[in-house]
Amino acid sequence: MRPILRPRDPMRRSASLKVQSYISLGLPGLGSRARKLGHIFLAGLGLALAAATPRPARAFGDVGAFDPRVLLTGSQTDAARPDAPARWAVELESRTSAPVRHRPLRVRADEGALTDEPFAYWSGDKAVEPLTANEISGLRRFVSLGGVLFVDDAAPEASGAAGPFGRSVRTELARVLPDSTPIAIGSEHVIFRTFYLLRRAEGRILGARTLDAIMRGGKAAVVLSEHDLGGALAKGVTGAWQFPVTPGGDAQRERAIRLAVNIAMYVLCSNYKDDQVHAPFLMRRRALEPSPSEP
């Protein structure tokens, strides 16, 4: 992966040259000790001036930008809450300054493009159609490469249990990952601590205190929610929230947004405590691709 090269900033260069010129004068009239202290002071001043100079903003779509891509299967054409992914990106950017894609993509489970990015958002309010062999293969490859899939049930039962969408997705995931069973993860898991400290999971509805996850190599590869997180995020064309949040109103919505931010940060960082950037997903994908000379 090539580093992103940036043009030199003339203001930074100017500040640096000024400091160098002052130091090169030898600060006449001062003793050697005072001259040494002066060198240190001017060098520090130069670093401060350089640091204060605004840096060019990162372009959308830079490597590492968070893209809450909508996963589509069967005849599905969009997320259950179509405006939620873009709002997710906006909230993440405004609260953390993390790079985001402002217009999240849509990707089908049987497309090779699924493995172009390390995150996919699968939401719905009705039962999904049985996955095709190609969809199963695509999702299995995505997870095996280290991708994170977030499953958001937009229509759970009143009790907080999975609705038709959630139940059917779990059935299909058992076909994708037959050797893995979802387990409950609560406030002790890093997802609840990546950026905000959260005590429980919440969305448009209160639901269970925990999320469910399919763990692969110690990492939550699939995260399942029966809270309609997208419903808490979605805004209409007027800028007003599209759906009421029950029973906790605005305070619950804020905590739901914080959970969405934490999930995004979990995707961007493979290990929060060590502050490590997410593992190079694209490099792993390319390592498994045949070279052009192979049939």
Regions found by a protein language model. Give the residues of each.
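Alpha-helical scaffolding within the catalytic cores
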Residues: R103-A109, T132-G138, L206-T210
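Structural recognition of the beta-strand scaffold that forms the well-ordered cores
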Residues: R69, P118-W122, V148-D152, P182-A184, ...
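Short alpha-beta junction capping motif
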Residues: F119-A162, G166
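N-terminal secretory signal peptides that target proteins for export/translocation
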Residues: M1-R35
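An acidic, glycine-rich "communication" segment
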Residues: G64-D67, Q76, R81-A84, P156-V261, ...
